[in-house]
Swiss-Prot record:
Functional summary from the UniProt entry: Component of the ubiquinol-cytochrome c reductase complex (complex III or cytochrome b-c1 complex) that is part of the mitochondrial respiratory chain. The b-c1 complex mediates electron transfer from ubiquinol to cytochrome c. Contributes to the generation of a proton gradient across the mitochondrial membrane that is then used for ATP synthesis.
Name of this protein: Cytochrome b
Positions contributing to heme b b562 binding: H82, H183
Residues annotated as transmembrane: 32-52, 76-98, 113-133, 179-199, 225-245, 289-309, 321-341, 348-368
Gene (name only): COB
Length: 390
């Protein structure tokens, strides 16, 4: 027996990474998991080194970021790699989730895997928001003010919760200090949940583009799929380096190069681009409480997907209607992101409300109806084939 199998610790690594049996038909969309792991490592490492030079005091937070950029050797690289790493983390995560939606990876027996994935998504959004506030630029200050103010919509106790979050009567020194403490903690929580995600994946193995159980047609992870993962890793690092070295502020906001000033309100208050679709859903509802409920529901509705999809065939590879509505959903989601970035005015108000309705309708109305129609068509087609054989 080889050492990697006899050693109790290396045997775990071996069973998950080296000898793990993978379906032979999986394509490059399945490489997003390894890229997400790489992004998490980049974020944790750059974050730890930046935390050595960052000060969470509100009087020094903005200056300490500039100190990292100007005085710390390689500090500019740490800051830009961390900021752009967050954007690339969400790019890979949205692609990973889109792959799961398209190929039906949320279906039984992988409901637990999907649920843990949604939890990782929520934790990642929370971590990104907390980190965005730590910069304490102009947009960070007002973003923190607006988003934390959402809790005031909770009846009876909402205002007390906001004061508790702030540690005062406005975003102030205690706010930034506790946000930084949580921002430092959450990536390690995410790493722990990622391990749970891999454990859940290990129970039934990866799905495949065909949507069938392929236990008889599998290959070891190393060196077939490890090599395939390395290809996308190199492509990712090239694109990531282009942004870090040549266009580091493309996915940021210029107002964050201005120190946070509670006396001056920006022309428009917007979060980072990866939160814009949910920000658009929040703004599409006139009532504050209902807007907050709708925004959180837009994330939690992902958890009902395994129960609303009643199709007898997993995935959309062989389903024309499901393909059409999936790509319409993707277009609608991108449109929500664009609407979240513009001012609340005509015609974007109505467009946001229609897009929000279509977002929820996809999960709660379209998928159940389409899966039922396709089940009937599959049944009719199978009966016709049976009659032809007779």
């Amino acid at each position: 027996m080889t050492f990697r199998k006899s050693n109790v610790y290396l045997n775990l690594v071996n069973s998950y990474i080296i000898d793990s049996p993978q379906p032979s038909s999986i394509n490059y969309w399945w490489n997003m998991g390894s890229l997400l792991g790489l992004c998490l490592v980049i974020q944790i490492l750059t974050g730890i080194f930046m935390a050595m030079h960052y000060s969470s005091n509100i009087e020094l937070a903005f200056s300490s970021v500039e100190h990292i950029m100007r005085d710390v050797q390689g500090g500019w690289f740490l800051r830009y790699a961390h900021a752009n790493g967050a954007s690339f983390f969400f790019i890979c995560m949205y692609i990973h989730m889109g792959k799961a939606l398209y190929y039906g990876s949320y279906r039984s027996p992988r409901v637990l895997l999907w649920t843990i994935g949604v939890i990782i998504f929520i934790l990642t959004m929370a971590t990104a928001f907390l980190g965005y506030c730590c910069v304490y630029g102009q947009m960070s200050h007002w973003g923190a003010t607006v988003i934390t103010n959402l809790f005031s919509a909770i009846p009876f106790i909402g205002k007390d919760i906001v004061l508790w979050l702030w540690g005062g009567f406005a975003v102030s020194n205690p706010t930034i200090q506790r946000f930084f403490a949580l921002h430092y903690l959450f990536p390690f929580v995410i790493a722990a949940v990622v391990i749970m995600h891999m454990m859940a994946l290990h129970i039934h193995g990866s799905s495949n583009p065909l949507g069938i159980t392929g236990n008889m047609d599998r290959l070891p992870m190393h060196g077939y799929f490890v090599f395939k993962d390395l290809i996308t890793v190199f492509v990712f690092l090239i694109v990531f380096s282009l942004f870090v070295f040549f266009s580091p502020n493309t996915m940021g906001h210029p107002d964050n190069y201005i120190p946070g000033n509670p006396m001056v309100t920006p022309a428009s208050i917007v979060p980072e681009w990866y939160l814009l679709p949910f920000y658009a859903i929040l703004r599409s509802i006139p009532d504050k409480l209902m807007g907050v409920i709708t925004m959180f529901s837009a994330i939690l509705v992902l958890l009902v997907l395994p129960f609303t999809d009643r199709s007898v065939v997993r995935g959309n590879s062989f389903k024309v209607l499901s393909k059409l509505f999936f790509f319409l959903f993707v277009f609608n989601f991108v449109l929500l992101g664009q609407i979240g970035a513009v001012h609340v005015e005509v015609p974007y108000i109505l467009m946001g409300q229609i897009s929000t309705f279509l977002y929820f309708a996809y999960f709660l109305v379209f998928i159940p109806i389409i899966s039922t129609i396709e089940n009937i068509l599959f049944y009719v087609g199978s009966r016709n084939n049976t009659d032809d054989l007779k």
